[in-house]
Amino acid sequence: MSNQLNTMDIKEIMNSLPHRYPFLLIDRVLDYTPGETLHAIKNVTINEPFFQGHFPIQPVMPGVLILEAMAQATGLLAYKTMEAAVTDDSLYYFAGIDKARFKRVVEPGDQLHFEVKMVKERRGIGVFTGVVKVDGELVCSAEIMCARREIKK
């Protein structure tokens, strides 16, 4: 049994997701097992564009962007599970969210750790669970659905 980790750097992430700055919210994948789990990180800095207005006096990362980042992590797991890439003829779309809960704010200097698990996949629709932590402390948890759809050319 190998202890080698399956990692992804930013180049491979950009080959697997259609998102680009300022909406690419995953910096690195630390490990993944296709069809099972993915662990990724996002380094949050004061230079993030959303901090200009949310909130200038007390910068806090918007919860919807934490969920979007979690959805991007599930998209990476889906692409790796299906051995697909953004250059193929389909995209994974954020299709639904349930049981989203926030437990802690995210501030500049935090490093988000995403842990997503594939629950099931059927007919191009994937169901995932995810948690986000900072320094081991729970930030957010949710169930996310994403749907694979062909790109119309």
Swiss-Prot record:
One of its GO terms (molecular function) is (3R)-hydroxyacyl-[acyl-carrier-protein] dehydratase activity. Keywords: Cytoplasm, Lipid A biosynthesis, Lipid biosynthesis, Lipid metabolism, Lyase. The keyword Signal does not apply. Its EC number is 4.2.1.59. It is found in: Cytoplasm. Gene3D superfamilies: Hotdog Thioesterase. SUPFAM superfamilies: Thioesterase/thiol ester dehydrase-isomerase (SSF54637). Its main location: cytoplasm. InterPro entries: FabA_FabZ (IPR013114), FabZ (IPR010084), HotDog_dom_sf (IPR029069). The keyword Ribosomal protein does not apply. It comes from the Bacteria. It holds the Pfam family FabA. GO terms for cellular component: cytoplasm; membrane. It is an enzyme of class 4 (lyase). GO terms for biological process: fatty acid biosynthetic process; lipid A biosynthetic process. The active site is at residue 54. It catalyses: a (3R)-hydroxyacyl-[ACP] = a (2E)-enoyl-[ACP] + H2O. Involved in unsaturated fatty acids biosynthesis. Catalyzes the dehydration of short chain beta-hydroxyacyl-ACPs and long chain saturated and unsaturated beta-hydroxyacyl-ACPs. Belongs to the thioester dehydratase family. FabZ subfamily. NCBIfam families: fabZ, PRK00006.1. This is 3-hydroxyacyl-[acyl-carrier-protein] dehydratase FabZ. The gene is fabZ.
